Amino acid sequence: MANVYDWFQERLEIQALADDVTSKYVPPHVNIFYCLGGITLTCFLIQFATGFAMTFYYKPTVTEAYASVQYIMNEVSFGWLIRSIHRWSASMMVLMMILHVFRVYLTGGFKKPRELTWISGVILAVITVSFGVTGYSLPWDQVGYWAVKIVSGVPEAIPVVGVLISDLLRGGSSVGQATLTRYYSAHTFVLPWLIAVFMLLHFLMIRKQGISGPL
């Protein structure tokens, strides 16, 4: 093992990286509530793993979506557990995200020079809610269908561009296959890439600026 370590150390200076990670100063006022962001990240990683597992069996069509979800729940080995963990961690992720936002706000973590960290966090919150909206529709049951119907119809109240936005969300003038395809694409491809990018920016800024001081 020593030879392997020396080989990597010579080329990548991994000890310097390890020292930088493990020797970061943590202010004495930090408590358990400062872990809410990390818990949110953990929930997302669980979401990613369980969601990826379900893509092997889920069929994003209006005629097969519901049946494929039932197949996952009843026929796939541990499918019920994987989907249940996905749902539970989704709820936990939203809850932890909300508590994290409140903690940052109440402790003044949004103030100068951390404005950009706060903005990236707000964007991450919007993306998290978008995950919930798009994922809720994927079983394409009565609850999911009418949820999409309501959500996609809300923008119609916006003057001038409202109808255009609704048609963009639905993939047409009515809810159907195009809608499910768009929500599935957003849930499994667009939103994961967006949240990965903004998480990276968020963590890099936290790493650079450190944890904010007490009020």
Curated annotation (Swiss-Prot):
The keyword Electron transport applies. Pfam families: Cytochrome_B. It comes from the Bacteria. Heme 1 (or BH or b566) is high-potential and absorbs at about 566 nm, and heme 2 (or BL or b562) is low-potential and absorbs at about 562 nm. Belongs to the cytochrome b family. PetB subfamily. Component of the cytochrome b6-f complex, which mediates electron transfer between photosystem II (PSII) and photosystem I (PSI), cyclic electron flow around PSI, and state transitions. This is Cytochrome b6. It comes from Mastigocladus laminosus (Fischerella sp.).
